């Protein structure tokens, strides 16, 4: 895969974010955003369904939208972290079946445990970085505890 011009529109698998412009015909064919997602990954799901129906998805760098981050969630960073992975797990269960869902969940567990095992190394960092690593460790700990419920 070669370089691409970031100033030119480009066909992509997924566009993520707060603004999507879609053809009415496409929405009629594939449906709206799936409300089963609490938040996060619903746009990935929509793009997947668009591709499955034969539509193409483009990223257009000239399109600019002002997004005031977090205005729709009002969650703590830890809650948002858990919700992000909830959305990903729901996506895998919905589109790839139980086996892939379980494999992703197991991979997520091992990756989270690895991150948690590395968290003591945070004490070797300067205080601001140390705090960031310790905060992330607390998020991964919460994620591990929530995995059986997901």
Where do the PLM segments sit?
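A C-terminal cap/extension of S-adenosyl-L-methionine-dependent methyltransferases
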Residues: 1-2, 6, 10, 27, ...
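A short, conserved alpha-helix in the catalytic core of glycosyltransferases
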Residues: 4-8, 13-64
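A structural signal for well-ordered alpha-helical scaffolds and beta->alpha junctions
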Residues: 5-8, 15, 81, 85, ...
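Residue-level signal for well-ordered alpha-helical scaffold segments within enzymatic catalytic domains
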Residues: 25, 29, 49, 87-90, ...
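Active-site-adjacent helix/loop segment of glycosyltransferases
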Residues: 48-131
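Membrane-interface aromatic/basic loop that binds lipid-linked glycans or pyrophosphate carriers
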Residues: 130-150
């Amino acid at each position: 895969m070669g370089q691409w011009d970031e100033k030119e529109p480009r066909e992509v698998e997924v566009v993520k974010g707060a603004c999507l412009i879609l053809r009415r015909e496409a929405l009629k064919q594939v449906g709206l955003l799936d409300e089963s997602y609490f938040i996060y990954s619903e746009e990935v799901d929509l793009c997947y369904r668009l591709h499955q129906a034969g539509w193409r998805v483009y990223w257009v760098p000239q399109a600019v939208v002002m997004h005031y981050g977090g205005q729709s969630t009002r969650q703590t960073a830890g809650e948002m972290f858990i919700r992000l992975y909830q959305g990903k797990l729901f996506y895998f269960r919905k589109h790839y079946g139980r086996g892939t869902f379980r494999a992703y969940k197991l991979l997520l567990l091992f990756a989270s445990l690895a991150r948690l095992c590395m968290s003591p190394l945070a004490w070797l960092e300067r205080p601001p970085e140390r705090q960031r690593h310790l905060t992330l460790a607390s998020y991964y700990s919460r994620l591990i505890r929530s995995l059986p419920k997901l």
